[in-house]
Each structure stands twice: as C-alpha cells, then as structure tokens.
C-alpha cells in the first residue's frame, strides 16, 4: 500500500549557516558598528539574540529572518520569545520548532478527513503517516495539505509505493 510521511523539520546545517551569515551581516552593518551584538545557536534548537537595546534586538530579528529565507528555511518554524531587557543589554530567545505536535497532527488528520479522500492518516510521534490504496489519492492528500494554511512548514518524506 502506498504511503508517505508528513514531517516538519529544519536542516541543522542550513540553520547554522544562516546564523553565521547573520553574524557576519552584523559585523558589516553601519548601525551595529562598535556594538556588542551577536547571534548564538545552542544545540540547533535555540537561537539567542543579544544587543545593548531592545530596538537593536528587533532589528536583529529582521536580519535573522532575511538570512533564514535566503537559506531556504521557512520562518514559520521559529517561535520568538519576549525581549528581556536589563542594565547589561537586551536578549531574546528564538526557539526552532522541530516535528509536528500532537494538536497540530490532529488538525492535519481532520483536514484530510474533511477532504473525504480515500486515505488513512496515523500519528507516529512527531510525524504523520498517510496511507492509501492509490498513488493518486496520496497526491491529492499532498495537494490538500499544501493548500491548507498551517502555522508550521510541512515537508513530505518517505514516499513508498
């Protein structure tokens, strides 16, 4: 029986490259000259932004988004925390979401059932397995999921006949 997996993952190498490019851009920008501002990537899951003021942290957010888009990473996978300000400066944690959460997986399954396609969807941890009798049904399911607007980027993987 043909099947495929629906996943939501971020390429860690591309993420590292995007953060490095964002740091390089900080070094070359005129409005950040002589300023202690930087991006730090922790375990490929959290990006820490730090700068002397919260205004500069917001500018850094725009730089980070631009670099991620240039590297082909969907910014919907990012969850921006609150800007923490103290005497030493301002910081913001940006969490990189990996995998499909249970609640979102249920929404995906409901969307497939609502489309009345001849496919079955089952939740396997942080991914969703969709099976059907015909390849055309699976292609229709992919089209339905691509058309639907979810708050996370979806990739389709492991297509088997």
Curated annotation (Swiss-Prot):
Record's GO cellular component terms: cytosol
Binding site for 3',3'-c-di-GMP 1: 33
GO molecular function, one term: nucleotide binding
Reported regulation of activity: Activity is regulated by cyclic di-GMP. Cyclic di-GMP specifically binds to XC_3703, which inhibits the interaction of the XC_2801-XC_3703 complex with DNA and prevents the transcription of the target genes.
InterPro entries in the record: DUF520, UPF0234-like_C, UPF0234_N, YajQ-like_sf
Classification via Pfam families: DUF520
Keyword Nucleotide-binding: yes
Binding, 3',3'-c-di-GMP 2: 133, 135-136, 161
Free-text disruption phenotype from the record: The deletion mutant shows reduced virulence to plants and alteration in biofilm formation. Deletion of the gene also leads to alteration in levels of transcript of a number of genes associated with a large range of biological functions.
Top-level taxon of the source organism: Bacteria
Alphabetical list of SUPFAM superfamilies matching this protein: YajQ-like (SSF89963)
Keywords: Nucleotide-binding, Virulence
Matches recorded under PANTHER family: UPF0234 PROTEIN YAJQ
Record's function text: Cyclic di-GMP effector that regulates bacterial virulence and biofilm formation. Binds bis-(3',5')-cyclic diguanylate (cyclic di-GMP or c-di-GMP), an important bacterial second messenger that controls a wide range of cellular processes. In the absence of cyclic di-GMP, XC_3703 positively affects the binding of the transcriptional regulator XC_2801 to its target genes and influences their transcription. The binding of cyclic di-GMP to XC_3703 inhibits the interaction of the XC_2801-XC_3703 complex with DNA, thus preventing the transcription of the target genes.
Subunit structure: Interacts with the LysR-type transcriptional regulator XC_2801.
Family membership noted in the UniProt record: Belongs to the YajQ family.
Notes concerning its domains: Consists of two domains (domain I and domain II) adopting the same topology, which is similar to that of the RNA-recognition motif (RRM). Domain I is composed of the first N-terminal beta-strand and residues 101 to the C-terminus, and domain II includes residues 11-100. Each domain contains a four-stranded antiparallel beta-sheet packed by two helices from one side.
Record-given protein name: Cyclic di-GMP-binding protein XC_3703
Species name: Xanthomonas campestris pv. campestris (strain 8004)
Organism classification: Bacteria, Pseudomonadati, Pseudomonadota, Gammaproteobacteria, Lysobacterales
